Amino acid sequence: MLSCLKEEMPPQELTRRLATVITHVDEIMQQEVRPLMAVEIIEQLHRQFAILSGGRGEDGAPIITFPEFSGFKHIPDEDFLNVMTYLTSIPSVEAASIGFIVVIDRRRDKWSSVKASLTRIAVAFPGNLQLIFILRPSRFIQRTFTDIGIKYYRNEFKTKVPIIMVNSVSDLHGYIDKSQLTRELGGTLEYRHGQWVNHRTAIENFALTLKTTAQMLQTFGSCLATAELPRSMLSTEDLLMSHTRQRDKLQDELKLLGKQGTTLLSCIQEPATKCPNSKLNLNQLENVTTMERLLVQLDETEKAFSHFWSEHHLKLNQCLQLQHFEHDFCKAKLALDNLLEEQAEFTGIGDSVMHVEQILKEHKKLEEKSQEPLEKAQLLALVGDQLIQSHHYAADAIRPRCVELRHLCDDFINGNKKKWDILGKSLEFHRQLDKVSQWCEAGIYLLASQAVDKCQSREGVDIALNDIATFLGTVKEYPLLSPKEFYNEFELLLTLDAKAKAQKVLQRLDDVQEIFHKRQVSLMKLAAKQTRPVQPVAPHPESSPKWVSSKTSQPSTSVPLARPLRTSEEPYTETELNSRGKEDDETKFEVKSEEIFESHHERGNPELEQQARLGDLSPRRRIIRDLLETEEIYIKEIKSIIDGYITPMDFIWLKHLIPDVLQNNKDFLFGNIRELYEFHNRTFLKELEKCAENPELLAHCFLKRKEDLQIYFKYHKNLPRARAIWQECQDCAYFGVCQRQLDHNLPLFKYLKGPSQRLIKYQMLLKGLLDFESPEDMEIDPGELGGSAKDGPKRTKDSAFSTELQQALAVIEDLIKSCELAVDLAAVTECPDDIGKLGKLLLHGPFSVWTIHKDRYKMKDLIRFKPSQRQIYLFERGIVFCKIRMEPGDQGLSPHYSFKKTMKLMTLSIRQLGRGSHRKFEIASRNGLEKYILQAASKEIRDCWFSEISKLLMEQQNNIKDQGNPQFEMSTSKGSGAGSGPWIKNMERATTSKEDPASSTGGIKGCSSREFSSMDTFEDCEGAEDMEKESSALSLAGLFQSDDSHETCSSKSAFLERGESSQGEKEERDEEETATRSTEEERAGASTGRLAPAGATAGFQARALRPRTSAQES
């Protein structure tokens, strides 16, 4: 690029010429001897206590006159000094060097004024004094005092300047010619002080403007001369237009300045122009000379800048011509760079025959695609050579471009030749490896098909041995190279990965051959023991268990070598069989299976032994074991998403399957799933493994990682956006390819909901540990041994382990609640940013709401008002009302919420209503002017909400009372006949529902607490899975429910509007009519909204869907 190339024309010439102009302006205006300007002392000059009339003495000395001024002695010293300094700096240096003649007119003044004038002149006159003429005071007494004073002080003034006392102007004319004196002194010199001040001010302003303009042109020229040349034609055109506009602006200023100077010069010469007989005084002549010299400097400034601009404009035009080459060069280089980048993406030699063949096809396409860019690049290099030969100013910049183009072309052509050779070798390399792998897989499947129960007879053994011998004979059909020959032929291709793969394949060949040998030995031994009865111990291969790693599974008597198949009930299974780690496990497990095959008659059934060992474990250790096993499966599932969906997005041969919207939003689709994987794989799993032998560390593990687990909140905060992207892109071919490659039966988004299910699993396991503590941590009441199992053992109150478990459970439940809140609030539009200040979300659900304003309506008119349907959220410190809208989506109508208002609890009161309102309660503002009547779907929901709000209000009231400043009141219905009775009753009922599992499950549906756990849940590992499904169905909604979470329950549909209008009052009327019809439907037994009672380990909110509830009850 030419961005680093500076314009070659130096600005020294322009800078030098303009600097000369500035210096000349300073000399003309005598800037060195005139520190002040007229505009700075304009007020002092207008007072006219001293003037420079323009008169001269006989020897040309300038005359400064001090006219009669009554307040002369009151003039500040600074003002006097400034005026004297300015007046003495105006005459030329030659005239000032002669000396100034001072004429002091004090004919009407006193001796004191004469003395003050002489004293100030003697002390503060900045110029060279030649003579002082004093016109004596005309009155006799003052003249006498003046004569005496002059005689007395003459010696003092004599040493500094000659003083001549004159009695009248006629005496003064004997010393100074009348033509050099103003009319006040009896002369004929025309002097107008206001005009003189205006001329001086205008001349100085003109000189200052000229100087400033010259400096501005200097700066502008430097900027233009040092500016970097642009990199494109459009940029060059823009730069040229910009510079031209700036130049035109400066040129206009120069022209305007020239007109101003010409006008000022005309004004100064006006007296002589109007009256040819009149002559200009010396001051006026000096002003004319000054303006003429300044105009000459202005003309010089214009010439210097015009010359510079012509060269700069020519340079920009040449640059614009250069940009044609630069533009073509950029396009050609970009095309070559893209070709080289695509070529560089083929650095891999392929990891399979299909991959290599695909690379060869793409490489051929790339070669065909490169023909046109190569021709253009070579032609452009020839154009560059022509520019160099034409002595272009940027020849040094063009020459490297031509060289670069030719080098890029040569690099690409040579790289293609080298690629063809390497890929040809790689294709043969992988074909050889595939031959070995195919033979090994065929052998493995042969071994897997030889079931144990078929080898119980001599005939079955002979058939198996014959099959093995036949298969080993087929090795002649595969011209396999020896390892030494293999490495010698493909030595250049053996990178670390290729070498590792070759070693694995060849090692697998050795392992399979060894397995065949052992199988033959085993079958021969088994044939010799046919007299002993053999009990079959393994099913057929088609019903054998799925492949699991030897780290997490017990040895089996079968040989599960086939690729595992997933079912919809098992979202967490092993991923691929083609990884090297699993191939090693496969061969090792095969060897181990031979030993089991050989000795299974001499020991009992291993599955029964495994069950016996599990039966020996305590419930606590079984739960820890379940936690570890599911944790490993969870990590592997996340890893499969990363390796199977995220990583392949960068594969060039799959890019055509990925739509742009998915490519641009892949980070939002997967969120921070990599962060989840790193945390669980590197940190959390290792800490959980330490709990296998010491379960007491489990709770501490969760508490220790409380902050790290907040990554789940970040994940779920992004989940709604991920769902939207998935719904838009779920049908693209890329997901289908990845799903088939991973052998997943479920789509991707089912696995993306795995973190949500994992949090539920943690919650259930922690609840299970609380219900199944070891005997040393329990106290069993002997009288309860015959009771129901659901009552469970009593926990020791001082058990530290139990306390930590409860704290850990609270951490997980709070995390689930915060995650669900993040998703729920994502559906609320126009939600304020400070909603987090209201604290934790406790309850939320749909309600019918009546609004009453006391100053507008009466209670007796209540029946005329129809309810509005609102989604209400109860937080620790406030209530949020949201409007419900049903909007069409991909799966039909779905609810959407819009924020309406927020009410702080500390400003509210609550009361129950009278008879006939068993589903309603009222909340009101503290002043009672604004009231809301809320109708729930059932009495149980009403009681739960009323109890929870009452509890929060009482807590806040107690806190305020402790501070001595109550801020709210609570009232009860007059019809109830009790003061706080309904509060206490509802609170007791809510407390009972939390503590009694039977009453909880049979009472308020949707309140998530620990009653859904029972001792029967954790009798075995399968029970934990059943409990997870049950808890998920009963406790979670929206975020944690199944993939059809966009569907809503029937009760919720009854609350939602079918089509809201945004037309003001009509919208509300339609909404209320719909709500009235919906209210009738709710009485049929609609399910509740999401409820989450607060407590020490408060659960998260839940939506109790009717189908799932019935399933749980069954």
From Swiss-Prot:
**Ranges of Polar residues composition bias in the record:** 546-559, 962-975
Q: Which GO terms describe its cellular component?
A: cytoplasm; cytosol
**All copies of domain CRAL-TRIO, residue ranges:** 11-193
What results from changing residue 1039 to F?
Answer: In a breast cancer sample; somatic mutation
Q: Which Pfam families match?
A: CRAL_TRIO_2, RhoGEF, SOS1_NGEF_PH, Spectrin_5
Acidic residues composition bias: which ranges?
Answer: 1017-1028
Give the Spectrin repeat ranges.
323-428
**Keyword flag Nucleotide-binding:** no
Pathological condition linked to this protein in its record? Type 2 diabetes mellitus: A multifactorial disorder of glucose homeostasis caused by a lack of sensitivity to insulin. Affected individuals usually have an obese body habitus and manifestations of a metabolic syndrome characterized by diabetes, insulin resistance, hypertension and hypertriglyceridemia. The disease results in long-term complications that affect the eyes, kidneys, nerves, and blood vessels.
Sequence similarity: Belongs to the MCF2 family.
The protein, known as: Probable guanine nucleotide exchange factor MCF2L2
Provide the gene name from the record.
MCF2L2
